[in-house]
A protein has these predicted regions:
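FAD-binding core of FAD-dependent oxidoreductases
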Residues: 49-63, 67-71, 78-101, 131-153, ...
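Exposed boundary/loop context
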Residues: 43, 47-49, 127-133, 155, ...
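C-terminal auxiliary extensions adjacent to catalytic cores
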Residues: 2-31, 35-38, 68, 151-507
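Well-ordered mid-protein domain cores that form the structural environment of catalytic cofactors
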Residues: 104-127, 134-145, 150, 162-183
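Hydrophobic alpha-helical context, especially transmembrane and signal-peptide helices
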Residues: 43-47, 125-131, 145, 166, ...
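Acidic, glycine-rich active-site loops and adjacent beta-strand->loop/helix elements
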Residues: 55, 82, 101-102, 122, ...
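Glycine-rich, flexible loop motifs
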Residues: 1-45, 70-131, 222, 235-238
Length: 507
């Protein structure tokens, strides 16, 4: 796959999840080389931040010529101070792709050898060890990116072929040489929003899958409940002028097509004589079943906006200073500041938390026999009192949803001045992205329990053949690894298997 100046979400998915390789285009190589050549000629006899000055609040100190290369190594080694568990390899790969595309803008003044080595890391599955904690998100992800830079110079550790190993050894085995500093590569690798952006990209991909599954689950819930189908109607949903609501309703109509489970109101209530004073079947189902387009619609809109922000960021020069050969100038500013990503990740985690809350309420409907009126408690297909069905799994779903609600407090407004008040207002963008990551992982856990419960409900009601073709396909796939059960057995492995299924499949 040719790496041009910009990348879209589809290409990112292929590189991240299908192991497509990136090949640098001739135009990108030309731009990188032009930027380096310009910096090399322009920087002579000038004071330029991070080339012949210290970093951050130390920028007031001039660095002597004989120490310029040492300076670039010093920022990498001094900032490799992360803590906590390692960021998973998928997210690290996304961060490296984000850094690569910053360099491909041709505004960083880095040597082409650095760009080539970074692309080799991506293509060969060499993933630097990056601790999760360390970034305040303004000067970007200095600490986490320093851990990437550390491995590019042959120091630190990398995950390679499933093992954590010395970077120098892995480079040697792959016939790769550690990068040697030229002008400002130490600063350029460490300075920017690439880690929070990489995490955000993976978050978005997984959140999109969650939304599709929530649509599927909501249709299946209404099939189980034998709901009236007019809440999905085009006329009803187009009466409200929000794209997301209309899209969700259309997705639901497509999914439910062919179902014999849902009812048509005109057939059941408009064209028949009803003399009963109290209707046995609910005229309008609970909000968690009926208001799905209105609940998931804003989430759809947020994911669309998140894509725009993330793709804009990954295709930007988030370095400082900006090296601009076109205007023959170098500009000092703050393109490393992560507020766009921080704000968007806060919104994303709020959206996914609301999706999780909908999922939890649908589980409650499914498990609560006095609410649904058609299923045994906790869809228990065994002996009531002796067996417990999925009773205890609701504890997991409820507690995990509660954690999502707590984690939805925003990081965007939690700025703490630091760095001798040089960084007196910061984004906390990586923290926001990491919290969104946790919320998304939690949501998959809750949704896994819902799909387990729905499969049990379908078996109890014996409606397999009445389901829509799409619902029947999902039911059959789930039953291939999660068979119907009546006796009490541990279910934690089944929950993990369901999560893996939900993350893998695209419906």
């Amino acid at each position: 796959m040719i790496a041009d100046k910009s990348i879209n979400l589809d290409t990112l998915y292929k590189v991240l999840f299908e192991d497509e390789k990136l090949e640098l285009s001739e135009e990108c190589i030309r731009k990188v080389e032009e930027s380096f050549d310009f910096l090399q000629s322009f920087s002579s006899d000038k004071i330029i931040y991070g080339i012949n000055t210290g970093f951050g609040p130390m920028a007031q100190y001039r660095i002597e010529d004989q120490s310029l290369i040492e300076l670039q190594y010093n920022i990498i080694r001094s900032h490799s101070t992360g803590a906590g568990k390692p960021l998973p390899e998928l997210y690290v790969k996304a961060a490296m792709i984000a850094r690569l595309y910053t360099f491909l803008q041709g505004k960083s003044g880095v040597h082409m050898e650095l760009v080539s080595l970074l692309s080799e890391f991506i293509n060969r599955g060499i993933c630097p060890f990056i601790p999760e904690h360390g970034s305040v998100g303004a000067s970007g992800d200095l600490v986490q990116l320093a851990h990437i830079a550390l491995t590019l110079i042959g120091e630190g550790e990398v995950f390679y072929q499933g093992k954590l190993r010395d970077a120098a050894t892995v480079l040697r085995e792959n016939g790769l040489n550690p990068f040697s500093m030229r002008i400002r590569e130490g600063l350029s690798v460490t300075n920017g929003t690439s880690v929070m952006t990489g995490i955000g990209i993976v978050n978005l991909i997984y959140a999109r899958k969650l939304l599709r599954w929530s649509v599927a689950a909501s249709v299946m819930m209404n099939e189980i409940a034998a709901s009236y189908d007019d809440f999905m109607a085009q006329a009803l949903n187009e009466a409200k002028h929000h794209r997301g609501q209309r899209e969700i309703a259309a997705m639901m109509r497509e999914w439910v097509s062919g179902s014999q489970c849902v009812l048509q109101r005109e057939n059941e209530l408009y064209n028949q004589v009803h003399k009963e004073k109290i209707f046995e079947h609910k005229v309008q189902p609970y909000y968690s079943l009926r208001c799905v387009p209105q609940i998931l619609g804003p989430i759809y809109d947020e994911l669309e906006n998140a894509e725009e922000v993330l793709i804009n960021e990954i295709n930007s020069a988030c370095d400082n200073p900006i090296i601009d050969p076109e205007t023959q100038n170098i500009y000092h500013g703050g393109n490393f500041h992560g507020d766009y990503i921080s704000f968007e990740m806060d919104k994303l985690k709020i959206a996914v938390t609301k999706l999780t809350m909908l999922c939890e309420r649908q589980i409650n409907y499914l498990f609560h026999d006095r609410i649904n009126g058609i299923l045994p408690p906790f869809v228990n297909l065994g002996v009531l009192g002796l067996n417990y069905g999925l009773q205890a799994s609701q504890f997991t779903a409820t507690s995990t949803t509660a954690e999502c609600q707590t984690l939805s407090n925003p990081m965007y407004v939690h700025s703490i001045p630091n760095n001798n008040d040089n960084q007196d207002i910061v984004s906390m963008g990586t923290n926001s992205a990491l919290l969104a990551k946790t919320v998304i992982e939690n949501s998959y856990q809750v949704m896994a329990i819902q799909f387990m419960g729905m499969a049990q409900a379908v078996d109890y009601l014996k409606i397999q053949k009445k389901l829509s073709p799409k619902s029947r396909q999902v039911y059959d796939e789930i039953r291939s690894f999660f068979p119907v059960f009546t006796n009490d057995t541990p279910k934690y492995k089944e929950i993990e298997a369901m999560i893996a299924y939900l993350k893998k499949e695209n419906k």
